[in-house]
Amino acid sequence: MTEEMQYEYLVPLEKYLSAGVRLGTRLSNKYLEDRGFIFAVRPDGLRIFDIKKIDERLKIAAKFIARYRPERVLVHTTRPYGFKPVQMFCKFVGCKALTGRFIPGTLTNPNLPHYQEVDLLFVVDPKLDAQAVAEAAKMGIPVIALVDTDTPHQYIDFMIPCNNKGRKSLALIFWILARQVLRERGELKPDQDLPVPPEEFETKLVQS
């Protein structure tokens, strides 16, 4: 039996594939390539992430997040498809959700009414959430981020390579992380799932 067959994924491999979690962009990213995160390049130029690497990073990220008091963890996204996944993750884990525009000074100016004092920042896309990442770096706050092949890696302390743009991908990623954080805390048994499926974390399309 090969090592790949023995490896136990957090969810069945088919779930990762159907959610498009491994799909990157057509942009090259030497930083991610050098670290073995990119598995292949399709004929059309689309980068494909190594699902096992994604799974491994999710396990580590869950352990990392579980070490912090949830009320001191801020999860931020300006990407609309990330709003529902972030809100659901924070609902189950107890973290603070900040969706939409990040007001300058949120992490750096205690005189502002919207100031947030946090110990860990988690962002969906460092490119779109650059203001939050920059303020966290200035304040010495560690940053976890979902990174695609078009994502800058500066100031990111721990990256989870994945498709950080798709509705289904973001829903599955945050569902897995919520479940794993609760398992790490002992609030769920090692084989216990969340009471809702990943689809409940998914942003619904509005019919016109």
From Swiss-Prot:
Listed Pfam families: Ribosomal_S2
Residues making up the signal peptide according to the UniProt record: none
Keyword terms of this UniProt record: Ribonucleoprotein, Ribosomal protein
Gene Ontology annotations of biological process type: ribosomal small subunit assembly; translation
GO molecular function: structural constituent of ribosome
UniProt region (Disordered), positions on chain: 189-208
Similarity remark: Belongs to the universal ribosomal protein uS2 family.
Protein name per the record: Small ribosomal subunit protein uS2
Organism per entry: Pyrobaculum aerophilum (strain ATCC 51768 / DSM 7523 / JCM 9630 / CIP 104966 / NBRC 100827 / IM2)
Lineage start: Archaea, Thermoproteota, Thermoprotei, Thermoproteales, Thermoproteaceae
